[in-house]
Amino acid sequence: MNGHFISFEGPDGAGKTTVLQAMVEHYQQRLKDQLTVTREPGGNPISEAIRTIILDKNNTEMDERTEALLYAAARRQHLVETILPALKKNHVVFCDRFVDSSIAYQGAGRKIGTDAVYQMNLFATEGALPEKTIYLDVPSELGLKRIMTHRTEDVDRLDLEQLDFHQRVRSAYLDLAKKFPDRIVVIDASQELDDVKRDVIEVLDQILN
């Protein structure tokens, strides 16, 4: 089996992590120890330490560019320590977020500029991108409603942003999907969960079968 790098993306409230876990359960028996599941920011001790700083809701004074640079630093370490070694072993890598998240959240959400953040991350990753990206799309209003309903005890600093921030994030994701149609597959995440899982499995089966 050849290695495959697959990322899962989506605005807050899209159910991304829930869907990713369902995909792990679906493919675990088939792939066994050839499946590597990781997340961003995180995936190794250094990147997890950076994650704690980024998402701490007490860090309200964090500058936008500081945030973007921290994400890029965590991503670099994640790539060289976790993702690339797994791919060299011909593993399938399921990654909860990658470069597209920074472009959407810091580039558009924080208004730093999507091109600037893209170039920053090209430097960090030396151009490495997922083979396929599953983008779970949900209207911002619905996403925020889900956050407040289901995640009241586990809300991080980015979840606390206002509606216009999340609308900019979603718009940037959709722009990326238009720019990279061969890599990014848009899934309607406003559907029932079983329907979302069915659509994602249909995409992944084309890669993994």
Curated annotation (Swiss-Prot):
Sequence positions that bind ATP: G10, P11, D12, G13, A14, G15, K16, T17
Q: Which residues form a coiled coil?
A: none
The EC code for this enzyme is: 2.7.4.9
Top-level enzyme category: transferase
Catalytic reaction annotation = dTMP + ATP = dTDP + ADP
Q: Which GO terms describe its molecular function?
A: ATP binding; dTMP kinase activity
State the protein's purpose.
Phosphorylation of dTMP to form dTDP in both de novo and salvage pathways of dTTP synthesis.
Please give the name of this protein. Answer: Thymidylate kinase
